[in-house]
Amino acid sequence: VSEAFGVRKAPFVIEWRDGFKISIAQIDAEHQHLFQLVKALNLQSADQTVNELLDYVVTHFSNEQALMEKSGYPSFEQHLKLHEEFGAQVAEFLGSGEDWTEERVQDVRRFLNKWLIGHIMTHDLRFGRWYKERQLTAPKPIAASKEQRGFLTRLFGLK
């Protein structure tokens, strides 16, 4: 917490809102969980929370991509590329080897929240609208194949 001139800076936290929903229940639940993990990030448990967050991002991206591919989403390849670019940004951002400080925790929160909101409110919302226009029933919960997880796991450098 920055204490310039004796003033404590409040933690950077963005709460999940219904306005972030894309109307696909599983994806919305996964997005909400991502927000909860970002909110839980703190100096005392930074490494543990970041590892849990990255693991869950891999699962979420895999599930979302599996649904896009299965449904024939025409912008699937572009969306996949956005996920890959995010992975590269995260690897660069977190791979610096810097020690955790309150400022770094806040920077990571800011980065993740900004990316999540921007991505959900543009690209995922576009997919949600496209999907709803073409589907008569809600999708069954999906889980990506191990092969897809393996690719994303390698992308994030996780074992």
Tell where the protein language model's regions lie, with residue ranges.
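Small-residue-biased structural context
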Residues: 2-159
